[in-house]
A protein has these predicted regions:
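Long, contiguous interaction/recruitment modules in multidomain scaffold/adaptor proteins
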Residues: 1-54, 58-60, 64
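Amphipathic alpha-helical segments of tetratricopeptide repeats
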Residues: 70-74, 108-113, 146-151, 155
Length: 171
């Protein structure tokens, strides 16, 4: 749950403590400091700043959330539970910035990777809405059929029914 700058600072401090402990021949502290620095580096590759980005997204600070997500240089190294949320957040940010081609790409990847049911419903709803904007009836209906297979709240069901009604009017 660190930014990259905070991770670097923590690693440097831990390595300095380890070096100091090694100088005073307290090898247990040296080993502990190195292991903790290793866990911070491991967290960078496996977790990334996704939790911080999600917090910024909920605060409606979309640019900050996007900047945090884009600091992840190799998203393919993320934990398999974090990858879908990386794509989901990027897709939702793209929807809010009205960049529908990127939104469709990221939300499509997130839907395939395995989101929780509620988040999957939101992703499929956005994908159906993007298909409606693009006047792509077939693709929109596929997303709606997929969304109907999962348990959704009444709010999402009513939104999907409205999207489906509008999709059926497309010739």
């Amino acid at each position: 749950m660190f930014t990259n700058q905070a991770r670097i600072l923590v690693c440097v401090l831990l390595l300095l403590v380890s070096a100091l402990a090694g100088y005073y021949e307290v090898y247990e502290i040296t080993a502990l400091g190195i292991m903790l620095a290793g866990s911070v580096v491991w967290g960078y590759f496996k977790e990334g700043p996704i939790i911080l980005a999600a917090k910024q997204y909920k605060l409606k600070n979309y640019q900050k959330a996007k900047d945090l997500l884009l600091t992840i240089k190799k998203p393919e190294y993320l934990n398999k539970r974090r990858k879908p949320y990386y794509e989901f957040l990027l897709g939702n940010i793209s929807v809010n910035q009205m960049d529908y081609t990127n939104a469709e790409y990221h939300l499509g990847k997130a839907a395939v990777m395995g989101l929780r049911a509620n988040d999957l419903g939101v992703a499929l709803m956005h994908l159906a809405n993007i298909s409606l904007r693009n006047k792509d009836k077939d693709k929109g209906m596929v997303w709606i059929i997929q969304a109907e297979k999962i348990p959704l709240t009444e709010k999402y069901k009513s939104i999907l029914k409205n999207i489906e009604k509008e999709l059926r009017q497309i010739k």
